[in-house]
Curated annotation (Swiss-Prot):
NCBIfam families linked: PRK04290.1-3 (NF003294)
Taxonomic source organism: Halobacterium salinarum (strain ATCC 700922 / JCM 11081 / NRC-1)
Pfam families linked: Ribosomal_S6e (PF01092)
Protein name as it appears in the record: Small ribosomal subunit protein eS6
InterPro entries hit by this protein: Ribosomal_eS6, Ribosomal_eS6_arc, Ribosomal_eS6_CS
UniProt-listed HAMAP family: Ribosomal_eS6
GO terms for cellular component: ribonucleoprotein complex; ribosome
Listed PANTHER family: 40S RIBOSOMAL PROTEIN S6
GO biological process: translation
Amino acid sequence: MATFQVAVADPESGRTYQFEVDGQDANRFIGREIGAAVDGGAVGLDGYTVEITGGSDDAGRPMREDVDGSDLMEVLLEGGAGFNPDEDGERKRVTVRGKEVSEAVAQLNVAIDEHGEEPVAELLGADGDDE
């Protein structure tokens, strides 16, 4: 059974809510890709739609939108998720995970895409990233 640490970003308020999702709710994310819309009920936001924006595995390797599948792959990067160059033109071969969510993913980042009728703070609790 898959278990994810999910960080839900609310672009309207600028707050982030973080909690663990497992079981049937976690299975709603399996097989989806970065950019895919998922029913917000999977993260406790009934009536909302959330978009998968990224994630990482248990070793901290980031998911990349431009790498197909869910496997690990060594890619030559010039920047972006997984590598921040110090000089212009610097490139580096880095191991990253593909854009498809699998059981190997430990953390998922999602953003609220469509808001429902009830406020987010009421559904998820008022304690966001200000702890």
